[in-house]
Regions:
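Intracellular loop-helix junctions on the cytosolic face of multi-pass helical membrane proteins
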Residues: 14-183, 205, 209-215
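Extended hydrophobic secondary-structure segments that form protein cores and membrane-embedded regions
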Residues: 1, 34-39, 223-225
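Hydrophobic alpha-helical transmembrane segments of integral membrane proteins
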Residues: 6-7, 199
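C-terminal substrate/ligand-recognition segments
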Residues: 158-160, 186-225
Length: 225
């Protein structure tokens, strides 16, 4: 859900900023505040939804029942303890350096995109900067995997029709683009590609790990990360 929201957030933020500039007359330096305002309102709404519907998932929340016996854990050997500490250190190293780089996405990399990348797309490339085209590609990927994973013939048929329809629509849109067509690309739009790859490649990675698991070669969690 986070990555789906991150996929649409750049386009939404740019659209709100443009609306504030064109309709309300705000300068570029002030109009972006409206995008943050909408994000803040969405966060407040999500918290309200969480507490309003908390009763629907309270049964899966943590906590021990009254009178429940305490769980006695086995003592680990020094070798087992060492293995777990090494695994934790590997995870910590990956997580620390990943987030050090990832958190540059909202500021440093956006500055880089604004100042050092081409902000105009031409021809077929214009499709890649339309978030709806990326969303359709994701639908096509999941529908294609569903063809092989569905247990019923009806499910396979529906998935096949959906994947074929989406791909046909994308081809139709691509054929309607003139070679000299061009669009201006705002720097924040480049942020939509990371969540796109995360969502689109999730079934691919799951299929790979599932295949390895069947062969008894599934990598450990640190190796997956």
């Amino acid at each position: 859900a986070i990555n789906v929201g991150s996929l649409f957030a750049p386009t939404t933020a740019v659209g709100i900023k443009r609306w504030a500039e064109e309709s309300l007359g705000y300068s570029s330096n002030d109009a972006y505040h409206f995008s943050f305002m909408v994000a803040c309102a969405a966060l407040i709404l999500s918290i309200l939804i969480y507490y309003a519907f908390r009763f629907t998932f309270r049964h899966v929340e943590g906590g021990k029942k009254k009178g429940e016996a305490a769980v006695v854990e086995d003592n680990l050997t020094p070798e087992q303890t060492k293995q777990r500490i090494v695994a934790l250190c590997l995870v910590f190293a990956v997580v620390i350096f990943f987030w050090m780089a990832f958190h540059q996405n909202g500021l440093t990399l956006t500055y880089f995109a604004d100042e050092f990348t081409e902000t105009t797309a031409f021809g077929f490339d214009t499709m890649l900067f339309d978030v709806w085209n990326l969303a359709l590609i994701i639908v096509a990927v999941y529908a294609t995997f569903s063809i092989f994973q569905s247990d019923s013939a009806k499910g396979k048929l529906f998935s096949g029709v959906l994947a074929s329809g989406v791909l046909a629509f994308l081809v139709y849109r691509a054929m309607g683009i003139e070679p000299n067509a061009e669009i201006a690309v705002a720097a924040p739009i480049f942020q939509q590609f990371n969540p796109f790859y995360v969502v689109a490649l999730t079934p691919v990675s799951m299929a790979i790990f599932g295949s390895l698991a069947k062969k008894g070669k599934e990598p450990s969690a640190p190796r997956k990360i």
